[in-house]
Amino acid sequence: MNALSRLLFLLPAFLTASPYVIDTISFPEDVPVEVGALDFAENGDLYVALRRGDIFVATPQEAPDQFAWRHFASGFHNACGIHIVAPGHLIIGQMAELTEVKDTDKDGIADSYQALSTEFGLSGNYHETMDICSDGNGGLYLAPGTASHNGPTFTTPRGNFADAGRFGRNYASVTWRGWVLHWHPETGITPFSSGYRMHNGIERDPQTGHVWCGDNQGDWRSSSPVYHVREDSFSGHPSSLVWDPRFAGIENPLLLPRRLLDDLWNKPAFRLPRSMMNSCAEPAFLPESFGPFAGQMLIPDQSGDRIVRLMPEMVDGAYQGAATMLIEGEPLHRGNNRLAFDHHGTLYVGQTGRGWGKLSEGLQRVRPTGDFGFEVITCQLSSSGFQLTFTEPLVKATNLRLTRYRYNYGYSYGGDELETKVVTPESVEIDSDQPTILHLTLPEGDLLSDHIYRFDLSGVSSDSKSYRGKLTYTLNRLLRPKAEHQITLTASGDDRYRVEINGDLFTEVRTKGFSNPILYPIHGPSGLAMTRDWPVREDGRPNEQQDHPHHKSLFLGHQGINGTNFWHENREESGIIEHARTIETRSGEDRALLRTFNLWKDSEGTVICTDTRELTFGLTDQGARYIDLELNLHASHGPVTLEEWKDGFLAIRTHPHLRLKPAKGKGV
């Protein structure tokens, strides 16, 4: 090859700067580098926990082959989580326990191992990993994974064993598997969120304090989801519900009514297709060193050679958003399992094989060069389509197409893209004032909730580059229309929700203190009360008849379900309807919404059935206030018989001035 041809061969690489420099960090030759966890101490030292049981520490060096690794601790059972309290003081999440590890004599080797918690079960199944992350307040969040049908459980598990938890491909036969737990040194373990299959990675956003975890495609997972972990939420995999006391006594969680699971399901903020993700691992949040992407989320692929960049945005009270690639392909290895940033903003990637697919293990370092290429910075939902912001001004945007599809939610392992439709934008406009911004308007009716949009942006280019990246948007909710009136719903203590219209009280949903949840008071547009005060207020109001004590403003009930009376109170056969969970609230603009889960219990406290209900509060165009109720009654705990009685379901006891009095012999 002559000098000219060599120059021409090198020219494209010279002109196109790489956004990242990737190094492979050397380890001692006799150490299998299967990284379960890694993090940096405040002094800059890097601690790496290996799944084979050892922890190593080194001070990072400029040259990747000059890290002087020191053996710090050993004897761990598949250590997959690490929290560094201080140099030489760690908390490790291993399969069997949460363990505090200290170097008390300051010789560089751990000499104190203390079990902080063994409150979660251990079945002996190989699949039960556990990552951890800080809660920012002295505690930790734990992510104990479920077991796999590909491996057995031992005959002597630790903790309680539930036969009902042994069903399905991935199962939760021992305590708290498939949950996110909260641990604090003063309170121990508290269940936080259920419904996870294999949440191999959990992290807290340092800006918002919100907790995130990914999960893996599999049973009850059509694709690889990423969840915003909300307290007392259910993320869709039912096996873990056997450890929820509200479902005590169920024989098989997989046979719970599908409508109940649908109603409880906290939908993932991101649903990543197989073309982008095979197995979600530990999330991380980008520091300032990553320029325009700072604050966004990364999630690595434990079964692929890629790291995905996520762009969360809050829409109508819940997260959703776009996903694209940060890095894909060589020199990045496969098996990307754990992420950590040093104090300079350099990304370290810990890799491990899991026993299937092409194995890869090791430790790599990713350093941004400052030239981030031609990429999408953000992709945000608009009222008529999407708004994209790029790293460089645009000169062309033609032939754009989107592919819309959805996934099923159900027992099947994985799932296909369903109801696929190519959507051609009605208009594509480069912003005249800010040419890095691209506005896409879709035809009316083509912007749908509960769908995923895949973008073909090959017709978009800057002055010197064409866009070649992958981009999808998980659209769970549409933007609410702007409204003249603000309708808000806020918690008031732990026993009620207050609904206001432009700051004036509409009603309160009272979830405790009575034999069933009620709405009281209910005010009309002029502020007048629409329902009776007694017996909610013991003194009632003047001239109010104090009869039918079960008539509490607006309530739900039924006189006979499986022999239990959920209408009248203080009778031998009377039961109660107990508010068990707030599924979600939405507030602002043109309506407020409350979704709850409730237990119908007999006189001995046994759950007969359950309900999910959705209350929507709003204003008509004419200014009238309305309450919309959707009630789903579920045979979740066994067969349900609705007996034939005159009293059942919705009832309202109005203000005395609104009452119609019957004429003798004629009725009302």
Regions found by a protein language model. Give the residues of each.
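Beta-strand-rich N-terminal accessory domains
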Residues: 482-548
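Sec-dependent signal peptide recognition
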Residues: 1-10
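Short, well-ordered beta-strand segments enriched in hydrophobic/aromatic residues
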Residues: 386-390, 440, 497-503, 627-635
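Bacterial Sec-dependent signal peptides at the C-terminal "C-region" and cleavage site
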Residues: 9-19
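Extended, loop-rich substrate-binding clefts of extracytoplasmic carbohydrate-active enzymes
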Residues: 547-623
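Acidic (Asp/Glu-rich), glycine- and aromatic
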Residues: 509-514, 518-524, 620-666
